[in-house]
Amino acid sequence: TGEEAVSEMINAMRLDRGTKVPVLHVRIRGNGECVQTFWAQGRELGCFRCLVQADHKNYREERYPVLKDQPKRRQLGCAGFTPYAVSAPMSAAALCLEVVVGWLETGRASPRFRTRSTSNANVYAVKDQDVKRLPACPACGSTDAALAAVRT
């Protein structure tokens, strides 16, 4: 959908229902400089909300920042949008297929968080990895840890 709020809602529904069905989040970052996938399944590793900080001092900052510059935005009539090249969705689809094919071949989706950038992108290198749960994550963490994070 391109809306982080929708991804967070899907994440919350997955956690609330305790489903074993995996959810694959795919996103284009910035103006298409890179694409990322995040495979969410079970509760042993981090959820989609664990991709941003949960503590009071760094609340909602990215745990794995990739963009060095703010994306350029455009306005057309009453709508705002982030322009990117036609190749960006193709890169996102290719990375999505890489994850799914790997899962079908091996039964595993590791690493669950993956990033691919264009060759000339001005981005930070982010390693492919399995994201650890944040103890204070408001979606999958413990209530005690969340309260402690707010107090510090």
Can you describe what each PLM-predicted range is?
Residues T1-T152:
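Glycine-rich phosphate/adenylate-binding loop
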